[in-house]
């Protein structure tokens, strides 16, 4: 996960200084056909993450990232995440959790081994994305993070570079509206998207932290429930 921080710092100059707060609604106001901005439908799998800062509701994508979703669900159902803190909070970037010892080093998958990445052009690091943390290629365990960068905070230069690199027009447009961290695409596995409670994630990202970006006051995951929408 240290690679995330280095990459973000390198690209921070490409982010505009405008914005930084979440609109009054807890949902992104994005007009897009990209699946991450759809509301849950019957048959979809969702997770409710209860924290002492509020509830974050996430739409999961088991068809696209089956191992990441299955790992997350099984760990949640086994109570693994109960009582675990958000051990990293970086304003306008991300919040991270999933380490049993409250550090960036702890954690393991349901298989007790690291598992491979599941990249897809259907899922991207828009604001509100839920993604697996790792320390290199195919090193996924139990840690995850939410993207909480500036809403609509991508510079024209960044968007132009994405166009030059032949990113899909729909993805570029979604990033333009929602903001996010496109530099993390194809490096970390996205497997979910916040559809309610985005402001809770942003509140966590703005807490006071120490020199290691660890919140000075613990922000705790109380429980995670997973269910199928009826």
Describe each region flagged by the PLM.
Residues 2-21:
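Sec-dependent N-terminal signal peptides of Gram-positive bacterial secreted proteins and lipoproteins
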Residues 18-230:
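Cyclophilin-like peptidyl-prolyl cis-trans isomerases
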